[in-house]
């Protein structure tokens, strides 16, 4: 046994650590009584030890989560914040014990009023003081917008900004040192919210990571609605079952896979892929298991075509080829897209009986003309954000089944044209990365593990993590030249089969060799 005098430092250190933990826990429990901010009603402040599987008893059932695993010790503060006389947001702020001096806001998805607890757990694990809100309503339906313009305004922009303002004040109250830098992390609707902050509140964040952004929002809603008139319902001549979409997908891959130089089942640049679906029209008398009818081939061709408005103006670019299998059960399932139907029912027409099967381009014109609270999020002059010193890193999966990656390219072009800046100048503050083999915000057939959330985590180093790459860009001035993605053998947390460095737009990946396509150094970013 060691002499007692050798054990004393260990005991002292252990006691000090325990005291710090006790002090943190006590600070958390007393924090609610110290919050006296206008329009803020604190529901509770509770200490959550790392390793807890946190029960989310009040989370709306449609949000799909009854619990959340939390890795770090955090102080969880839940509150309601009034945004008008008839609206409020539910806001949570999580303060980690391993605080790194960084503030972060998470975003939302779809039309939803769901706090993304998985993002809050993810970012507090990195030491960010993190806020998340319900976007001004509960659940995934658009019905709360019906005759409630204040709720709609929260959804369009106000929820995120309110959460940031309150969250920063609370962070300064909870930590004596306040915070040094402010960040944002979101995808889909969360991506749109990130760009809305860049456009409308250029001083809210030092660094914004915005994935698969749902900007050009009104036209995105219409684009999502326009697939049903193309496919028709199950049983119609124009409808393809998921199995038939797999047949179409395999033919598209056959025609386009090797454009990038590698036969790996991944299309590196879908803009170069213009499949000819007549090649698999069934011959007379042939089995239809591995070919399409003429009507079905036309459906595939029309699905891969942009949406134009009543006067021939481009509303929304085409769905990128390569996403067919992922999109089939959601966008091409023979039913009107639920989010689009809700938007037209409860926002555009204020008519709960509007039928999504009747959609046409006149409806698209009505939605775009309305554009409540500039929810389009399509402003292209980012000069104030640039002058503030802010950085925005956006990414988009090239197998995205819900929001076409072509739309992110279109916005990039709009910014370049509006600001009169070529890519090398935009790179100073705005970088866009196309992620081959990534579906909507994650998943897919390729190297989608870029660290934009728990479901894509493959390491915390900036080289393997898009959030920490943003931190490095903001705090050290080292901008990411590529975004490395991991191809998992069997989903997140499993063995990494290979990695690939995804290129900064407008560059694209080309296989040069030598070696196998699984070697990230066998690829080159070219313009």
From Swiss-Prot:
Alphabetically ordered keywords of this record: Calcium, Carbohydrate metabolism, Disulfide bond, Glycoprotein, Hydrolase, Metal-binding, Polysaccharide degradation, Secreted, Serine esterase, Signal, Xylan degradation
Q: Which compartments does it reside in?
A: Secreted
Record-annotated disulphide pairs: 28-75, 63-114, 187-441, 256-273, 282-291, 503-525
Residues annotated as transmembrane = none
Q: What class of enzyme is it?
A: hydrolase
Assigned EC number? 3.1.1.73
Using the UniProt record, give the first listed, main subcellular location.
secreted
Looking at the UniProt record for this protein, which Gene Ontology cellular component terms does it annotate, in alphabetical order?
extracellular region
Which residues of this protein are catalytic?
188 (acyl-ester intermediate), 400 (charge relay system), 440 (charge relay system)
Q: Where is the signal peptide?
A: 1-19
Name the family. Answer: Belongs to the tannase family.
What protein is this chain from? Probable feruloyl esterase B-2
């Amino acid at each position: 046994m060691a002499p007692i005098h050798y054990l004393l430092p260990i005991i002292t250190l252990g006691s000090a650590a325990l005291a710090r933990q006790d002090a943190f826990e006590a600070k958390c429990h007393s924090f609610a009584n110290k919050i006296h901010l206008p329009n803020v009603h604190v529901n509770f402040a509770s200490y959550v030890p790392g390793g807890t599987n946190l029960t989310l008893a009040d989370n709306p059932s449609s949000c799909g989560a009854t619990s959340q695993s939390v890795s770090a010790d955090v102080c969880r503060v839940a509150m309601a914040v009034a945004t008008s006389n008839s609206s409020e947001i539910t806001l949570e702020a999580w303060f980690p014990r391993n605080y790194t001096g960084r503030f972060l806001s998470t975003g939302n998805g779809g039309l939803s009023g769901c706090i993304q607890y998985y993002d809050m757990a993810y970012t507090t694990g990195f030491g960010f003081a993190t806020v998340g809100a319900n976007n001004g309503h509960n659940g995934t339906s658009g019905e709360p917008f019906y005759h409630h313009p204040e709720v709609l305004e929260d959804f369009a922009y106000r929820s995120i900004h309110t959460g940031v303002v309150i969250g920063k004040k609370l962070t300064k109250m909870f930590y004596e040192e306040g915070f040094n830098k402010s960040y944002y992390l979101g995808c889909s609707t969360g991506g749109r919210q990130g760009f809305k902050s860049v456009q409308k509140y250029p001083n809210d964040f030092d660094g914004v990571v915005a994935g698969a952004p749902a900007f050009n929002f009104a036209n995105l809603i219409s684009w999502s609605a326009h697939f049903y008139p193309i496919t028709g319902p199950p049983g119609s001549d124009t409808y393809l079952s998921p199995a038939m979409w797999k047949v179409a997908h395999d033919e598209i891959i056959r025609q386009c896979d090797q454009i990038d130089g590698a036969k790996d089942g991944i299309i590196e640049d879908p803009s170069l892929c213009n499949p000819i679906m007549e090649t698999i029209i069934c011959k007379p008398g042939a089995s239809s298991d591995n070919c399409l009818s003429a009507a079905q081939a036309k459906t595939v061709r029309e699905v891969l075509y942009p949406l134009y408005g009543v006067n021939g103006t481009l509303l929304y670019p085409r769905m990128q080829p390569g996403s067919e299998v992922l999109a089939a059960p959601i966008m091409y399932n023979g039913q009107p897209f639920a989010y689009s139907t809700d938007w037209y029912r409860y926002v555009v027409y204020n008519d709960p009986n509007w039928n999504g099967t009747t959609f046409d381009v006149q409806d698209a014109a009505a939605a775009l003309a309305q554009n409540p609270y500039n929810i389009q999020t399509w402003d292209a002059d980012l000069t104030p954000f640039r002058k503030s010193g802010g950085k925005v890193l956006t990414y988009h999966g090239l197998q995205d089944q819900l929001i076409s990656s072509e739309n992110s390219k279109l916005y990039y072009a709009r910014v370049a044209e509006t600001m009169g800046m070529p890519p090398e100048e935009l790179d100073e503050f705005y970088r866009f990365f196309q992620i081959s083999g990534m579906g909507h915000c994650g998943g897919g057939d390729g190297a989608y593990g870029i660290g934009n959330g728990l479901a894509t985590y493959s390491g915390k180093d900036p080289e393997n993590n898009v959030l920490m790459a943003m931190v490095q860009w903001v705090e050290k001035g080292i901008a990411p030249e590529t975004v490395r993605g991991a191809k998992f053998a069997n989903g997140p947390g499993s063995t990494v089969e290979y990695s690939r460095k995804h290129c900064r737009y407008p560059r694209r990946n080309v296989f040069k060799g030598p070696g196998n396509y699984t070697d990230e150094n066998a690829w080159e970013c070219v313009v």
